[in-house]
Amino acid sequence: MKSIGIFVVALWLTHFCDGGQLGARIYSSGSESSVLLFDQYINKYAFTNGDVKIIYEGKSIFEILSETYVTDFNIFDRAISQDNLDMFQIVQFPLAGQAIVMTYNLPELVNSSYRLVIDRETLGKIWYGAISKWNDTAIQNLNPTVGHLLPDTDIILGYSDDYIMTISGLIKMALSSFSPEFDTELKYANNTFNGMNPTKNGRGHNIGETSTVRLEWLKKTSYGLTYINYADVYNNGTDSTVPMNMYNKAGYFVEPNLVSVQAAMSDFKIFYANNNSTIDIYDAPGNKSWPLAYVNYLGCSSAFGPMADCTRTIQMTNFIAWIYTNDAASESAIELQFYPLDKTLQKVAIDNLYNIKCNNIAVLSQQYLIGFGAPISVMSLWPNSWTTVASTARYYSAPSSQALELQETYGADFGITVTGVPNTYFNKMPDLGVMPLAAFTIVPAYNIPAINGTNGTLILDYEIITDIYLGIINNWNDSRIRALNGIEINRKLPNVSITVIYQAVSSDYNFMFTDFMSKKSPKFAKKIGSTYFPILTLPNNSMIITTDIYDVGNQLISNSNSFAFWPYFGITMLSRQPTVQAASIRTEKGNIISSNSTTLEKAINNFISKGGSIEDAPYIMGENDESWPLSALMTMIYRQSTIHYAAKAAAVADFAYWTQSNPTAINIATIQGMYVASNNPTLKSRNLNLLKNFVVDGEPISSIANCIYQGTICSDMGTCNNNSCLCNSYRKGIYCENIVSSSGESIGIILAIVIPVSFVICCIIIVLVIALIVSIRLHQRVEDEWEVDFHELDFMESLGSGGSGEVFKAMWKGTEVAVKKLVNSNITKDAERNFKQEIHRMTSLRHPNVVLFMAASTRPPNMCIVMEFMSLGSLYDLLGNELVTEIPPVLRIRIAYQAAKGMHFLHSSDIVHRDLKSLNLLLDSKWNVKVSDFGLTKIKDNNKGKSSTKEDSVCSIQWTAPEVLSEKQDIDYILADVYSFGIIMWELMTRLRPYIGLSPAAIAVAVIRDNLRPEIQEEDINLMSSDYVELVNICWHKDTMIRPSFLEIMTKLSTLIGGSGITTGTSTSSSNQSSDYIGPNIITRTKNIHNNDETKNSFGSTTYGSNTISSSSNTESDKILSKLNKKKIPTGEVIIVFTDIISAEQLWHHNPLAMKNATVLYNAVIRETLDKIGGYESFIYKDHNSGEGSFCLVFQEAIDAIDFCSISQKKLLEIDWPEELLDHPAAASEKDINGTMIFAGPRVRMGLHAGTVKIMQDPVTRRYEYSGVTVNIAAKITMMTHGGQVIMSEQVTDKISNNDCSNIKSLGQIEITDTNNYKVNIFELRIEGLIGRFFGGVAFYNYDSVTESTDLDDTYPDSLNFSTNGILYGGIKQENEYLSSAGLCRWIINYDDIQIGKQIGVGSYGIVNMGKWKNINVAVKKFVKQKIDEKQMLEFRAEIAFLSQLRHPHIILMIGACLKRPNICIVTEFMGNGSLRNVIKTTKPEWKLKIKMLYQTALGIGYLHNSDPIIIHRDIKPSNILVDDSMNVKIADFGFARIKEENSVMTRCGTPCWTAPEIIRGEKYTEKVDVFSFGIVMWEVLTCKEPFSGCNFMKVSMDILEGARPQIPSDCPIDFTKLMKQCWHAKPDKRPSMEDVIMGLNDMLGPEKSL
């Protein structure tokens, strides 16, 4: 039986089923004991990789073996033997440890917290029948506390005799190991429990194979005993099912837990290290080991193929790798009492992953480096910062000695030691590489609040330190301490006890400081000595003992007046303010020395120059008074020539070189007070030689090996490019080791002798010309690497506009890219030169969190930058997208971390952003964040102290630091970027727009004057944690010195997402993989979210014919929404329901505001009913806006769809519709002959059809669009339906044939000719209570092919078309032939009908182009922000409808609007002379014309103020006053205040020259703000100058608030001056009305006015 089972497994593993959807579905089965574990794994993995759907089913071993042809991998409780692994090319991986527990049900002990204890021998006797009673003496002796309670009752045993690869077989083997007698009896019984005495005596029962079954049996069986997985008992047990504790093989008492199971695994690690993955770990010999431990194994083929596509194999392998490397996987397993592998075993398992091959190529391409070593803070940041797409590094803290031992067994890819390498290890490992990476100091550290802030630090000497540790000095005010320190510190030293903190655990740092102090003080050597584990004899109230090797730093900062030796980097990482400080030391010669970069560097350089041994130095003692006396080398250890995998060795080499050469890596170490080894020439040379000799199979493995020569890179005379030297012009040779010799002189002599002088001159000229050409060609070649021909770019839709240009989506060489095209008006000679300089700068910037520069066109007028396309758009849009219903806190923090990482890189590269905001943080398809728009900025050193002019001002006021707003001198723009990042973190926390409702000027004034910041509420703190909020507050702090660097921000955010924090004891791992886990209690913010809509119309498509859904869009949004949206979407054969408001066009024309409100009410009823019934709202079409009157709804069950129609039709009668709308016949209330209300409000028709569909998914929101023939037929059925009527197809009624169908009436048959002459029998649903509705059949227009119906009089159109605004079915232009007929309103324009011309301006909306529509010249104002949510779109519809009705000779005619993305815009009449600003600037009009234009302007403003409702312009200025060819003026840019505000963050905002003071103060305002603006316009027209010229944004704002106004010319007429001053009065109530202004200007015009 066993051999048959193994054979079946082998057949499956070698065949490897390729079923399921490509790259989307992995099916597995395995033991029941692993169900809980895999449920957790699968849930967590969905947040790491949403591209793959993993299914796991727990089954019996025989079921597993019988269905191996349909599974992708299996999980076993036992290992497959090595013979079978080799024979059938199987690879298996130890997955997780579990504890089996003997579990009992004793009613007498139910109320007791005591657990019975059993030993191995006694347990064996119970199971072979020598002990049969619960009160047996052996059991009582083991449990004296409750022995008297044990009953004289039979022990009832529950078991399973399944043996193959089950824990029952493992239990038999364990019991045989426990008891020789049991082993003998088991063999007599043919290896079955069934044949042993307990069963023969009626006390043994075969109760089932699985642990869960045995647990259920035990719950019902008093006095029962069986073996169960501890995870099952822990998660599903009751008070009556209690697991036993045990005495293990070594005789020690143990409990089932993480420690005891991992100890058992560790006992067998030597077998795993030798690649033996077939062992069982029961009855382990260790002191802490659980006797009944076992390991789950995952098995799969090691040789897949031949296969056309290895994607599924790759996905499976990535999942296995994730199990071993993700912290969330380990943590969730531990919570359920499954125990992750020992870290060294994880490393072995990961290495085995590289043995999985597909088509003879290793499947796993990413290299996972595992390192162990001393707890060093830099090792929490270096791996995270280095990790690339191809490599991942993880670092775990362990003593240096353990790091060395793991190298011996290949248990780690690299190690870190801080105590050197003893010579004995070189004997064991001749190829051991020892590479110093950095050095650090170990310091006497103190936390004395009383002396914080004083000049200098506390001074101590070695004898004082000794006496502190011996308890001789126990007060900080001791006279000997005072004698060493100055007056200021002496005055503040407190009279309090010294609290000594030390580690009562073996520690590298213990050894270094005790050995050092023993050499400095004989007294210390005698009393304490050199030891890894010091023992102090201080009073308990004078010391704090910690057993955590990382916790000294935490204890120091948590306990005032404390003292300890600790690494310097450990105290710098504790807090922003120097609460814990390093004491200075007075040396034996009386000199005072402090720990700093200089004294550390001198200590290391002195040690190296004197030939100090790098390999075996436990620490470094400074030998002069300029060197810090105690420092240590942080040294990387690795196997120099025997690493098994070349790719892994290469990754180790690259990581090592990166730490020594990369500016980010060096900066990370330097900031933490470390000295990087590459700063020392000897160490740098030594390390390079080590990399040169780093080999696998004798071949150099480092990516720079071929460039290393005598400890240099290319002899320091060139650069290493693709592992070969590119020499400087005057050097040559493989390593640039030779100087280029000059033979020109001798050649010249020969030529002078041989050739006439004239020929020589000609040759020289030719050489010079050739040299010049070559130089030009070389320079051009460098530029050609990134220069692109503008005409190679295939431009697509606009993605948005910024301060310096517009961004387009484009295709370039078959790749989607983003192209930023510079505004032509900005391109001067200086701008062109600066642009090229910045491009050169950008070509060198490469970072995973910075948008990738790809190419550029530098030739005017088509200057542009080509960048990678970020498919998910900006963070600004994502946060405002209402369809992304939830973003988990951990993902928000990770987004912030990635953004900080990108900014840290820019700052490290000497680049400041100066326009950092959520709009400039972009997301790719995997939700990776990248910083954009940093180009075209200045290098920071050239920018400090410089101000931006108002022409350069981009409206990013919300994110701008107060010092930048106030134009202070010597601005640190690095810290200004940090301020902006604080606002972004607030946006991530709240998903709100900062300072919504305030004008830019009001924001700027409040930020500077009132220190205003966006509001943080209690719910924000609850959602994101107080630590996150604290980081926000210090980022946007007014005091720039308090703001952190981006490196500090990264560290804090890394801690919040489960990153390291080694020195403060928060974690021992530096994994770059966050734990993307969303707990069950996600807090949902209920605040209004502005700007919510789909981010893109980019869909992947998959056709589904089953209940299994999987996206092919490959986006990380699956991580979030696939788990947050628990509702299962309808798939397979579904019911499509269309709902549609008929006559919507008429109702919008009748009263736009009322129709807007009615549409909101209608949408709410449909969605509330849908949620109650359980359907799904589909996108109707990609370019169609939601919520316009039509819904496409999808149901899995027909009865649910019919119930929805009935309930919603009734609910629509209960709504309190707007009275103004009920005046229209298409919405009027109607009653039947009995007085029952049967109609009220807009009439809603509904059509239903059933069938299969095509489903496409949006990559951002994960919302699905349903399409196909079934949807089209449902839409056509809806088109023939009257308002208030519900019609369905026969395919729907067939699905409810078993229900009462008395309320369903047949209407006959129709033929739909555009779907292969599809004939449809249709039926009407008669809704109870609405029977009085009479329709007389269906509503046809010219429908044909209608048969077998007396009610169907007309014919049906023979084609299905889509109109641009409504959804048209057929060619007859009648309103109700459309779904969403709201799109047919006369003021809604099809963008394709407009011929777009040249750009003529940039306004508050965005870009303005000239155009032609129906042979009429028009102005097209296209919004920068194209993502408008449903609520805003309805408001926009209502406002455009209202504004299009306005008619006045002095306001611009609103022709209409285009409502479809990506071309949302408004269309107005075109004014030939442009703006008033342009006219007065270029023509200098005469006085009478000036007064005439002002008079007409006032008339236009007055009309707006007298409209109902009143229209306040808020932005009156000459650029918004347009002039026609006859010099008549019209007011433009009125209305759409909300959309203007949303768009303003993407466009230039200029200065508030025309803004009334009440707006700047953020107060409520009236139409008098327009009067104020008009007063400024009067001055501007008067003088033909720009107000407040030369003043920046903040000066203008403050001047207006302080009452400053433009200077009035002395020759200005008195009446004009008086009116102007009245208009711009500071107090609104003192300003005239526009009627008064009109009268005043009318008087100035006199009788000659010509209007």
From Swiss-Prot:
Residues bearing attached sugar chains per UniProt: 111, 135, 190, 236, 275-276, 287, 452, 455, 477, 495, 540, 596, 722
PROSITE patterns for the chain: GUANYLATE_CYCLASE_2, PROTEIN_KINASE_ATP, PROTEIN_KINASE_DOM, PROTEIN_KINASE_ST
Binding site for ATP: 799-807, 820, 1400-1408, 1421
Residue span, Guanylate cyclase domain: 1135-1278
Annotated spans, Disordered: 1089-1115
CDD domains attached to this UniProt entry: STKc_MAP3K-like (cd13999)
InterPro entries, A to Z: A/G_cyclase, Kinase-like_dom_sf, Nucleotide_cyclase, Prot_kinase_dom, Protein_kinase_ATP_BS, Ser-Thr/Tyr_kinase_cat_dom, Ser/Thr_kinase_AS, Ser/Thr_Kinases-Pseudokinases
Catalytic activity: L-seryl-[protein] + ATP = O-phospho-L-seryl-[protein] + ADP + H(+); L-threonyl-[protein] + ATP = O-phospho-L-threonyl-[protein] + ADP + H(+)
SMART domains tied to this protein: CYCc, S_TKc
Record field: compositional bias (Low complexity): 1100-1115
Gene3D superfamilies, per database record: Nucleotide cyclase (3.30.70.1230), Periplasmic binding protein-like II (3.40.190.10), Phosphorylase Kinase, domain 1 (3.30.200.20), Transferase(Phosphotransferase) domain 1 (1.10.510.10)
GO biological process assignments: cyclic nucleotide biosynthetic process; intracellular signal transduction
Protein name: Putative serine/threonine-protein kinase/receptor R818
